């Protein structure tokens, strides 16, 4: 798409927004319902696209993408009417007689830039929240998942006039052109490197941003944990989508006493969940492209592999891999892995683990497996991270009742459900002052009696 075409889309959306057409709640609900119906209609095409881009099975596509999108749509259709209402707040006595309230208002023209790892979910979920809040939206799906991007464009074109919601497909040139435009809000999901670029571009227009980034999400396993169940849930969360999940456990950090047994249980679970030859499992996906395939393979130290390690370059597949005797200085610990490679590191005390985790960049997620409630409380209170689980992995993002977002280097802002509505809304603080009474004490000339009254009101 050309620079001129992109500018025209943004200008038309701004003009459309200023007509007030997106403000009525009924219109927002109609848009969400239409989108839901269209997604249900195109589910087979969505599944096919996700299979071609990432090798996802239909089951995984529904569980991790389409189903979550439909759930968010249903939730926002139910709750948008209440979220969109003005919220009356207490008026101080000094402002008698008046009514004070907070009025949720859309920002205007929103840009949503989404990644390739969950290309449908991470494009449509923020769109849902932005529409519910009353905005117009420009979507920029990832060029790395072209089949899903084309299906998204088909759905959006059928559902919406481009002056309301539009899709811009393309690569780096389109990204740069979009970021040079003046949007009223930018929502970005992707790497920390690109997130910094987005924030720098947004600062030119003082545009607010939500950044959903990544990081090395630790999975702490305390010695009281149920190791069989721990292994089962770690294997699920780590190797889902071949490890290409922003909240996947990046590495295991376990008590030294239980490491060997934990690794044995993980090896068992890999065989149980993926079979003895995972690369022949039709439900096991693939790495997105050759660049990332090569990058992940280069992180694997064959001398430290205790499970997996094999790959199929032609199919861009890497078997579920576990590495033992890893140190924080190893290559695999210098960047977010974003693939099916699980390093195992050990600590001698929980305090040591907390200190180490806090010495690193704040992760998007943190997981703690333990039977000790005090240990769970200590870790979740003392460590900085976006969100996480106690005795499970990744499921904290699969609910509309809690916001999902990063912290520090892993991002800023959150979305899903009410948090998503808040993200895409500006709350105007308004005082409606009555005209039937006008107390004189704020006006000059000031008097002693007014000062006494003022001091009673304001203290």
Where are these regions (language model features)?
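Residues at or immediately preceding the N-termini of alpha-helices
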Residues: 3-6, 25, 43, 227, ...
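ALDH superfamily catalytic-core signature
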Residues: 160, 193-327, 390, 452, ...
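Residue-level signal for inorganic ion chemistry
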Residues: 28, 73, 134, 165, ...
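N-terminal Rossmann-like NAD(P)+-binding subdomain of aldehyde/semialdehyde dehydrogenases
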Residues: 1-101
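Rossmann-like NAD(P) dinucleotide-binding subdomain of oxidoreductase/dehydrogenase enzymes
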Residues: 93-229
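Structural signal for hydrophobic packing residues in well-ordered secondary-structure cores
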Residues: 17, 21, 36-39, 43, ...
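Short, well-ordered beta-strand elements within core beta-sheets of diverse protein domains
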Residues: 15-21, 112, 219-221, 251-256, ...
């Amino acid at each position: 798409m050309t620079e001129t075409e992109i500018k025209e889309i943004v200008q038309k959306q701004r003009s459309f927004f200023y007509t007030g057409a997106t403000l009525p709640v009924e219109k927002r609900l109609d848009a969400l319902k239409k989108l839901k119906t269209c997604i249900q209609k195109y589910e087979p095409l969505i599944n096919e696209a996700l299979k071609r881009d990432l090798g996802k099975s239909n089951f995984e596509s529904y569980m991790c993408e389409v189903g979550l999108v439909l759930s968010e749509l249903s939730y926002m259709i139910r709750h948008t009417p209440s979220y969109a209402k003005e919220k009356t707040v207490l008026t101080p006595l000094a402002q008698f007689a008046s009514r004070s309230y907070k009025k949720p208002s859309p920002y205007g023209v929103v840009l949503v830039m989404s990644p390739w790892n969950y290309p449908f979910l991470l494009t449509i979920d923020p769109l849902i929240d932005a529409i519910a809040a009353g905005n117009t939206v420009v979507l920029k799906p990832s060029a790395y998942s072209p089949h899903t991007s084309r299906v998204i464009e088909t759905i959006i074109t059928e559902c919406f006039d481009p002056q309301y919601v539009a899709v811009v497909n393309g690569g780096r040139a389109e990204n740069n052109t979009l970021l040079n435009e003046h949007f009223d809000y930018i929502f970005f999901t992707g790497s920390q490197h690109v997130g910094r670029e987005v924030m720098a571009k947004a600062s030119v227009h003082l545009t607010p941003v939500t950044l959903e980034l990544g990081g090395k999400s630790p999975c702490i396993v305390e010695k009281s944990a149920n190791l069989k169940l721990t292994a089962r849930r770690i294997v699920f969360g780590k190797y889902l989508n071949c490890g290409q999940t922003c909240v996947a456990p990046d590495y295991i950090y376990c008590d030294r006493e239980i490491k060997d047994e934990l690794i044995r249980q993980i090896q068992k679970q890999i065989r149980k969940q993926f079979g003895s030859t995972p690369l022949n499992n039709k439900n096991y996906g693939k790495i997105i492209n050759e660049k990332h395939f090569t990058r992940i393979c280069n992180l694997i130290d064959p001398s430290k592999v205790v499970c997996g390690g094999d790959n199929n370059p032609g199919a861009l597949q890497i078997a579920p891999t576990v590495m033992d005797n890893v140190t924080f200085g190893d290559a695999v610990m210098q960047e977010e892995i974003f693939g099916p490679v699980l390093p195992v590191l050990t600590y001698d005390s929980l305090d040591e683990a907390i200190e180490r985790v806090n010495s690193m960049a704040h992760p998007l997620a943190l997981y703690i497996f333990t039977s000790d409630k005090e240990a769970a409380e200590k870790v979740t209170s003392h460590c900085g991270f976006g969100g996480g689980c106690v005795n499970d992995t990744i499921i904290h993002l699969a609910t509309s009742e809690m916001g999902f977002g990063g912290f520090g280097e892993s991002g800023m802002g959150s979305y899903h459900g009410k948090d998503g509505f808040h993200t895409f809304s500006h709350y105007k603080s308004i005082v409606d002052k009555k005209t039937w009474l006008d107390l004189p004490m704020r006006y000059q000339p000031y008097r002693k009696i007014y000062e006494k009254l003022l001091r009673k009101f304001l203290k």
